[in-house]
């Protein structure tokens, strides 16, 4: 298992290591969404108070750093997941050809790759926060990433603890980093966390929803090996369960948008998500395992669209669009 495939050159090894991080797939890019959304929302709020307080270039720079930080940390987490799960992955049809499960990458190579990604992500966080509260934010996230693969073990299903919980927390938590990138020099960490609670809750519920749908693709193999996952709760009522889960993120979005109270975000975020998620549930077919993968992809597109929507809101606040509209209406 731990012997690398013979005659694999440096370029082949690099590609295999990138595969352990999932950088060649879209999934890791989910992890930057909470941080980037929070960066833009915090920036828009600050511009709403004083349009000259920040430049758009500064906000984009901080959002870019958050993107790189989250991606590197996710890459390290994915490599760690494959290290821990390599024996399980080798027995699952969808995962048996992963580099560690198939023996194409050694444990030493994977550990070095994981460590390099982790410390680069720490360096990015240092740049984002200007040296403040780095390990205060990094350690809880590190702990959740290390714990995640173990929550797939059947013992946790007995206490109704599922890996989707930790995944949701890990993907939502970087919202604090994003907000702190804008206001970290002005607000104490406790206040920043309070601002980010609605975003963290949204991403937590959202992640539990789309990851439960995605995990349903492996339900046949997972049941054979008694793998723990949230869809176990649903049994044969998986569609109804997903419908319930899909409502939870929709209930949290208004708490985020109301802080800015932007008509643009009510339409581009709240309305768009509502229509999309209703369509996802309507089109889901529990007899076609691949339909869970479709929900996962559709929500990735929703996340990307929300980044665009928040970027537009930053621009609208910078030019005082809503103040001008309000003044025009009063005339």
Curated annotation (Swiss-Prot):
Q: Which Pfam families match?
A: UbiA (PF01040)
**Mind listing the UniProt keywords for this protein, alphabetically?**
Golgi apparatus, Magnesium, Membrane, Transferase, Transmembrane, Transmembrane helix
Citing just one GO molecular function, the answer is: prenyltransferase activity
Keyword Ligase listed? The answer is no
Pathway participation: Secondary metabolite biosynthesis; terpenoid biosynthesis
Q: Which cofactor does it need?
A: Mg(2+)
Instruction: List the GO biological process terms.
Output: mycophenolic acid biosynthetic process; terpenoid biosynthetic process
Q: For this UniProt entry, what's an example GO CC term?
A: Golgi membrane
Q: How does it sit in the membrane?
A: Multi-pass membrane protein
Q: Does the keyword Membrane apply?
A: yes
Q: Where in the cell is it found?
A: Golgi apparatus membrane
**EC number per UniProt:** 2.5.1.-
Q: Which reaction does it catalyse?
A: 5,7-dihydroxy-4-methylphthalide + (2E,6E)-farnesyl diphosphate = 4-farnesyl-3,5-dihydroxy-6-methylphthalide + diphosphate
Chain segments annotated as transmembrane: 27-47, 56-76, 127-147, 159-179, 190-210, 240-260, 264-284, 295-315
Query: What is the documented function of this protein?
Result: Polyprenyl transferase; part of the gene cluster that mediates the biosynthesis of mycophenolic acid (MPA), the first isolated antibiotic natural product in the world obtained from a culture of Penicillium brevicompactum in 1893. MpaA' is a Golgi apparatus-associated enzyme that catalyzes the prenylation of 5,7-dihydroxy-4,6-dimethylphthalide (DHMP) to yield farnesyl-DHMP (FDHMP). The first step of the pathway is the synthesis of 5-methylorsellinic acid (5MOA) by the cytosolic polyketide synthase mpaC.
The similarity comment for this entry is: Belongs to the UbiA prenyltransferase family.
Q: What is this protein called?
A: Polyprenyl transferase mpaA'
Q: What organism is recorded for this protein?
A: Penicillium brevicompactum
Q: What is the lineage of its organism?
A: Eukaryota, Fungi, Dikarya, Ascomycota, Pezizomycotina
The gene behind this protein is: mpaA'
């Amino acid at each position: 298992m731990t012997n690398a495939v013979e005659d694999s050159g440096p370029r082949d090894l690099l590609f295999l290591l990138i595969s352990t991080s999932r950088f060649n797939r879209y999934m890791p890019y989910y992890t930057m969404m909470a941080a980037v959304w929070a960066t833009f929302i915090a920036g828009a709020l600050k511009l709403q108070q004083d349009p000259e307080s920040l430049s758009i270039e500064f906000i984009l720079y901080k959002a870019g750093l958050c993107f790189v930080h989250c991606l590197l940390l996710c890459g390290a987490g994915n490599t760690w997941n494959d290290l821990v799960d390599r024996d399980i992955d080798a027995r699952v049809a969808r995962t048996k050809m992963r580099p560690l499960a198939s023996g194409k990458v050694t444990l030493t190579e994977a550990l070095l790759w994981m460590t390099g990604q982790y410390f680069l992500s720490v360096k990015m966080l240092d740049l984002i926060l200007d040296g403040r509260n780095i390990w205060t934010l990094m350690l809880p996230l590190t702990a959740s990433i290390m714990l995640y693969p173990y929550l797939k073990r059947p013992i946790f299903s007995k206490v109704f603890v599922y890996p989707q919980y930790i995944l949701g927390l890990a993907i939502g938590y970087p919202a604090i980093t994003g907000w702190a990138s804008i206001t970290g020099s002005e607000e104490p960490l406790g206040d920043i966390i309070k601002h980010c609670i609605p975003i963290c809750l949204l991403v937590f519920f959202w992640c539990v929803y789309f990851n439960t749908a995605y995990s349903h693709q492996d339900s046949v193999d997972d049941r054979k090996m008694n793998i723990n996952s949230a869809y176990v709760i649903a049994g044969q009522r998986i569609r109804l369960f997903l419908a319930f889960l899909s409502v939870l993120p929709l209930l949290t979005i208004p708490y985020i948008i109301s802080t800015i109270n932007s008509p643009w975000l009510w339409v581009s975020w709240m309305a768009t998500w509502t229509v999309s998620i209703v369509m996802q549930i309507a089109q889901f077919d529990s007899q076609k395992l691949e339909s869970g993968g479709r929900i996962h992809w559709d929500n990735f597109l929703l996340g990307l669209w929300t980044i665009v929507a928040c970027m537009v809101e930053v621009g609208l606040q910078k030019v005082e669009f809503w103040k001008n509209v309000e003044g025009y209406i009063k005339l």
